[in-house]
From Swiss-Prot:
This protein's name: L-seryl-tRNA(Sec) selenium transferase
Keywords for the protein's UniProt record, in alphabetical order: Cytoplasm, Protein biosynthesis, Pyridoxal phosphate, Selenium, Transferase
Top EC class for this record: transferase
Gene this protein is translated from: selA
The keyword Protein biosynthesis is annotated on this UniProt entry: yes
Modified residues (N6-(pyridoxal phosphate)lysine): K282
Documented EC number(s): 2.9.1.1
GO CC term, one of those recorded: cytoplasm
Length: 440
């Protein structure tokens, strides 16, 4: 006797009127999934069709909830890695749309009708902007670090300060990347102090490169010292070695003056080392990419590495990066949203907060607070901001707002919305969404 005879047929579930609005492939998948799950935990109790349909609809709603969707970033973290880091300006997107939605000359030379370079147009703009000999783009800065080390130092040794052997989000650790690239690591100095003589004394027959890694996601305070890249480059040059700066998150132009103290500018650094790399979607404010700048002969070696094929970027990334570079070269900084959010003055942020507060149906308090740069950038710096605080259980409010795709934060046991990271074009949507929420 079939013990599952009480189960409704899959077809009857799929064809039920209550599932009519869902796509066929969604209905088939979740009807089968729920029935299989119940069969695994089968009891002798009769399984009703209504109970199954209820579970199927619950699964479908959870599935849709997990889909990629836009959110309002009210966290106060400008370059929020979990929320996609830098936002692309609508005008840049419109400029890219014709290329993205059609065939393009991504790797085709329109002059001679032959295969062209995937990177040519972007690389010329990178050289213009940063005044470097040559450049290359890969899919992120971790890939850039791996490619540089594997291409220039394979089976050899690199020297790095113990205080710069960083770990970033997702357990990306510099020592492990060095090892994976087929390179031996020589650690020098201590966690808080490293001197030029430490590097000099560590140089041996198998040394190929001196590596400096910018501490972009943590800060050392108090009794500490490090060697700048210029001095490391001079030492490397004297000893016939290479110097490489893994910058991680560097700034280019027009950044808030409160943030730039002790923060290296890319254009200056590229003149002080043989090769450097940084992320395209952090302080640079563009698409995810690993941007490599440096000496022409070194970049040529990177281009010859078979790994480059695996690390190359697609036409979407190239399109967005190309338009961002145009904006920088034309000094049209308003199109770089990350810069705008970091540069917005306090009075502008206050106006946004007051507008929302005025139109909300709920009691809130306007307060001054601090925003963060985020994205593993400038951990020791913050920016003045205005927040709205909401009365009630902070954790419950945070969850309730998150269900409406509004990502706030908890500060001093209060749920708050930070208006530095809420864009002007999101204010009306924010007001309508909050006013439609019940039982706040």
């Amino acid at each position: 006797m079939n013990k599952f005879r009480t189960f409704p047929q899959i077809n009857t579930l799929i064809e039920d009127e209550s599932l009519k609005s869902y796509p066929f492939y969604i209905k088939v998948f979740f009807c089968k999934k729920v029935v299989a799950k119940l069969k695994e935990n089968f009891s002798q109790d009769e399984i009703s069709k209504d109970k199954l349909l209820l579970e199927i609809k619950k699964e479908i709603k959870t599935f849709y909830r997990k889909d990629l969707q836009s959110v309002i970033n009210a966290s106060g973290v400008v370059i929020h890695t979990n929320l996609g880091r830098s936002v692309i300006h609508e005008e840049l997107y419109e400029a890219c749309k014709d290329i993205i939605c059609n065939y393009s000359n991504v790797e085709f030379d329109l002059e001679n009708g032959k295969r062209g370079s995937r990177y040519a147009l972007v690389l010329e703009k990178l050289k213009m902007l940063f005044e470097c000999e040559d450049a290359l783009v890969v899919n992120n800065n971790a890939a850039a670090v791996f490619l540089v080390l594997n291409s220039l130092c394979y089976d050899k040794e690199v020297i790095s300060s113990r205080g710069e052997l960083v770990e970033i989000g997702g357990s990306f650790r510099v020592p492990e990347v060095i090892k994976a690239a087929g390179v031996k690591l020589c650690e020098v100095g201590t966690s808080n102090k490293t001197h030029l003589k430490d590097y000099e004394q560590a140089i041996g027959e198998n040394t190929a490169l001196i590596l400096k890694t910018h501490k972009s996601n943590f800060a050392l305070m108090g009794f500490h010292s490090e060697v700048n890249i210029k001095d490391l480059h001079e030492l490397a040059k004297e000893k016939g070695l290479l110097s490489y700066y893994d910058l991680g998150s560097g700034w280019c132009e027009n950044l808030n003056e409160k943030l730039i103290k002790n923060e290296p500018k890319i254009k200056k650094l590229v003149q002080e080392c043989d090769i450097l790399s940084f992320s395209g979607d952090k302080l640079f404010g563009s698409a995810q990419a690993g941007i490599i700048l440096g000496k022409k002969e070194l970049i040529e070696k990177l281009k010859q590495n078979q790994l480059l094929r695996m690390l190359r970027v697609d036409k979407l990334t190239l399109s967005f990066l190309n338009e961002s570079l145009k904006a920088y070269l034309q000094k049209d900084y308003k199109k770089i949203i990350t810069l705008k959010l970091l540069n917005d003055d306090l009075s502008f942020i206050e106006k946004k907060a007051l507008r929302v507060q005025k139109e909300l149906n709920f009691q809130t308090q306007l307060k001054k607070s601090k925003s963060l740069v985020g994205g593993g950038s400038m951990p020791d710096k913050s920016l003045d901001t205005y927040i709205l605080t909401f009365q009630g259980d902070a954790l419950k409010l945070q969850t309730r707002f998150r269900k409406e795709n509004i990502i706030g934060r908890i500060e001093n046991d209060e749920f708050v919305l930070d208006f530095r990271t809420i864009r002007e074009n999101e204010l009306q949507k924010l007001i309508l969404t909050i006013n439609q929420m019940e039982n706040l």
